[in-house]
C-alpha cells in the first residue's frame, strides 16, 4: 500500500523515479499520521473500522497504514517501537542509496546488498524451538513465532534496552552447543531444531 500511495503522488513517474520517491516520501513521513489510499467511507453496516477518534486502541497504533476497502483496518497494527525504528532506519538508508543512484554515483546493485545482521549488535537472545516429530515441530515453531511479539513488548519495557530487532531467518543449531535440557543424541531425522535470533542494544 505504501507503493500504491507513492504511485498516487507521482502518477506519471518512471519506475526508477518511483523507487526513489518511495524512499523520499516515507523517510520524511511523520508517523503516526496514517497512510490513506482513499478517504474512509461512511457505510453503516455495523462493522468496526479504524477510527482513532472513536476507538482508543487505534490511537495507540504507531504506523497506521489503512486498507482502502470497507471496513477499513490498520494493516500494520502489530508494529511496535522496535519494528518501527528498524523500518525507519532501513527506509532512510534506502533513500540515501537511491539519492546516490539517481545522481549516477552508484548502481542499483547497492540497494540490494545484504546486510550482516550479527555485526549490528553485541547482545543476542536465541530462542530454541524443539520437538520430537516433524509434524509437532511445524505446529510448535508456528506457536513460538506467534508469541515473539509479546516478548518484544516485554524487552521494550526494560529501561536498559533501547531496541529489540528480530531476525526473521531460522538456523539449524550446532548440536554440541544446545542446552543440556535438550536431547542432543536424538537421531530422528524428523527432529528439526530451529533457532529464532533476536538482538537488542542497550541504551
Locate the predicted segments by residue:
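Non-catalytic helical "accessory" subdomain of NTase-fold nucleotidyltransferases
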Residues: 1-203
Amino acid at each position: 500500500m505504501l507503493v500504491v500511495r507513492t504511485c498516487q503522488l507521482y502518477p506519471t513517474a518512471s519506475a526508477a523515479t518511483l523507487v526513489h520517491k518511495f524512499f523520499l516520501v516515507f523517510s520524511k513521513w511523520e508517523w503516526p499520521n496514517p497512510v490513506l489510499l482513499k478517504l474512509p467511507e461512511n457505510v453503516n453496516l455495523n462493522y468496526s473500522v479504524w477510527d482513532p477518534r472513536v476507538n482508543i486502541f487505534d490511537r495507540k497504533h504507531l504506523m497506521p497504514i489503512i486498507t482502502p476497502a470497507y471496513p477499513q483496518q490498520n494493516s500494520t497494527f502489530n508494529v511496535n517501537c522496535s519494528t518501527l525504528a528498524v523500518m525507519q532506519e532501513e527506509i532512510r538508508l534506502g533513500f540515501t542509496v537511491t539519492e546516490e543512484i539517481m545522481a549516477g554515483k552508484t548502481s542499483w546493485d547497492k540497494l540490494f546488498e545484504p546486510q550482516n545482521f550479527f555485526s549490528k549488535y553485541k547482545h543476542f537472545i536465541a530462542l530454541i524451538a524443539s520437538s520430537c516429530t516433524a509434524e509437532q515441530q511445524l505446529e510448535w515453531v508456528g506457536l513460538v513465532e506467534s508469541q515473539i511479539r509479546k516478548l518484544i513488548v516485554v524487552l521494550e519495557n526494560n529501561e536498559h534496552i533501547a531496541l529489540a530487532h528480530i531476525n526473521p531467518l531460522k538456523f539449524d543449531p550446532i548440536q554440541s552447543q544446545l542446552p543440556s535440557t535438550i536431547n542432543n543424541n536424538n537421531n530422528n531425522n524428523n527432529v528439526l531444531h530451529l533457532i529464532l535470533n533476536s538482538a537488542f542494544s542497550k541504551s
